[in-house]
Amino acid sequence: MPDADAGPAEYRCVLTGALLFHSDSPHELVEGGVAYAVRGSLDDGLEALAAGDGEQAAATAAAGFPTDVIDVIARARLQPLELDRPAFIQRWQAYLRALQAAVERDHGVERTERLALGAQIFAKKLLREFDELDFFTPPADSGDGPPPAAAPLAVLGYREDELTPYVYFLKEGVREVRGGANT
């Protein structure tokens, strides 16, 4: 049983240690346990930016950019990725190869095979809905240049109501860390 005094958990990438989401964001396993679906909400982006960087908030408002942000995306500082279908497939495959190597090392071949099958089925679903999705990744550690190809891929979609954002992460690519530690 988790230690209640440890505080909320963070869910981090098993490959990079990057923050993906917090335990206080409603989340559930979907697609037969292959992925986490993290429910988001729209927040006032200026407020969220001001909490982290007041100058950036002012510049965003002055430039006339949209000011609503999805809380899950903003809290994890996920960066948007512009992907067409071929780029998505290439990026997904690179991430999956790196993830499979880590899962095989830590959990064995059987779990890796389940990941491969589940991820393939999930990717086909994502491709069917491709035009309705947006893609994100955690910021690169150095902050310079594009994120590494094997960095986690977060997928943003909306439920049937077209108002409720959900961010999807492959379950095997996420580990729970209590107390906010990055280890």
Predicted features by range, described:
Residues 1-151, 157-183:
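Non-catalytic accessory regions used for complex assembly or targeting
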